[in-house]
Structures are given as C-alpha cells and as structure tokens.
Amino acid sequence: MQAIDIGHVTLERDGTGVFSDLTLRLTERRIGIVGRNGAGKSSLIRLITGLVTPQKGRVVVNGVDVAADRAGALGTVGLLFQNPDHQIIFPVVRDEIAFGLEQKGLKRAAALARAEAVLAAQGRADWGDRLCHTLSQGQRQLLCLMSILAMEPDWILFDEPFNALDLPTALSIEARIAGLAQNVVLVTHDPSRLTGFDRILWLEGGRIEADGPPAEVLPRYIAAMQALARAGAC
C-alpha cells in the first residue's frame, strides 16, 4: 500500500515550534491541505519530502525514511514548489529535467534520453534546447512538473501551485494534476481546487483542526474563514 507515515514528529524552525508530537497516516490517492498562512502547511510537505528534518520522530514514505535516505526519497516523493524559480537550477530545459535523473544514478546519456522522452510525452518535444528564463510562469511550472514526472515518484506534493498563474494556465495545471497516476497531496488556499479529493487536512497553528472527507471538512473551514473575515482577524 502507498502510505505516508508521520510518527510522533516534533519540528522547530528558527527556534519556533511548528509541530509537537504530530502523528498521521496518509494513504488516500488525493489529499488536500488547507489552512491560514503560518498554519504549518508548507512545513508539513517539506517534512514529507525530507527537505526538513524533525527534532523528534520520523517520516516514512512507502517504507523510505525520507530524512535519512535522501537517495531513496528522490524516487519516492516529489515536490512542486509554489514558485518555479525556487526550483529551476539549470539554464537549459533538457539539462533541468536530466539533473534529477542523474542524482538517481542514471548516466548522463540515459538521463538526457529520458528527458527527451518526457518532453515528447507532454507534447513539448521542441523545448529541449530552450532557455528556462524564456518560458512563461506557467511554462516554468510545467517544466518543474515534468522534471518530477521524469523521476517517476509514487507521491507528488504541490505547494500552492496556482499562485501567480492566470486563469487559463491554472486550469491547465489543475487538469494535469487531475490526470496524474501518482498519489497527490495538494496545499491550497482555494477549497474549490479540492473538488473530488478523497481526504482533507485542515491545519491550524501546527495542529490538525479537522481531518476527513471534503464534504465534512471544507464547509467547516470555509465558515471559519468567513467568520474571521467578518471579524477583521485575517
């Protein structure tokens, strides 16, 4: 079974407590995470990908301790950042996609061939020689997604992927996410993006405020946010 197991995790960042004894098991194919700024959403997905290491406890994804086994984590879980410019390293599209594959152990020629195959599969065979900085925001977001898909992870996590995108581009990315074979964890401020999801986590101040099906969690979340807006507390 595909599973993310978060066991008794305590996390502090810059001297501030984020999570205390957090325990979760995630097995659903489509999981949404909502919450206000500072609730711990981004910290949670960085824990799941192994980008941050907890002071206590551990995170295991499909049997891989993601903080202890970085090589294993690369083939198990991928993360699409909110801003693609925080993710793109190389100036040329082909090299950007090939980089992660080389980190997994592929030889340079095999990694480049795999990059070309991924581009072709996504209808972007003509992108290989393009400079990353010439791509639009939405195109750079797609490049980051293709780089993740090339790694063939079991889980793909998305941290506010629709921010700064115009509506047509956001809808295009949303459709691509919906069509993914991988398990998906999506962080968003927009509950409408979570239609058809299997499970919703509502984070509040580093704790789980609610956890369950969208029909149960999202109305409570929306009502709470509306109440805060009326009170001028947001």
Curated annotation (Swiss-Prot):
Positions bound to ATP: G35, R36, N37, G38, A39, G40, K41, S42
Keyword Electron transport included in the entry's annotation: no
Family: Belongs to the ABC transporter superfamily.
Gene (UniProt): bioM
Record note on what altering K41N does: Diminished biotin uptake, loss of ATPase activity, BioMNY complexes still form
Protein name: Biotin transport ATP-binding protein BioM
Organism of origin: Rhodobacter capsulatus (strain ATCC BAA-309 / NBRC 16581 / SB1003)
Subcellular location(s) per record: Cell inner membrane
Subunit structure of this chain's protein: Part of a biotin transporter holocomplex composed of BioM, BioN and BioY. BioMN complexes can be readily purified, but not BioMY complexes. Only the BioMNY complex has ATPase activity.
Topology relative to the membrane: Peripheral membrane protein
Lineage: Bacteria, Pseudomonadati, Pseudomonadota, Alphaproteobacteria, Rhodobacterales
Enzyme Commission number: 7.6.2.-
Cited Gene3D superfamilies: P-loop containing nucleotide triphosphate hydrolases (3.40.50.300)
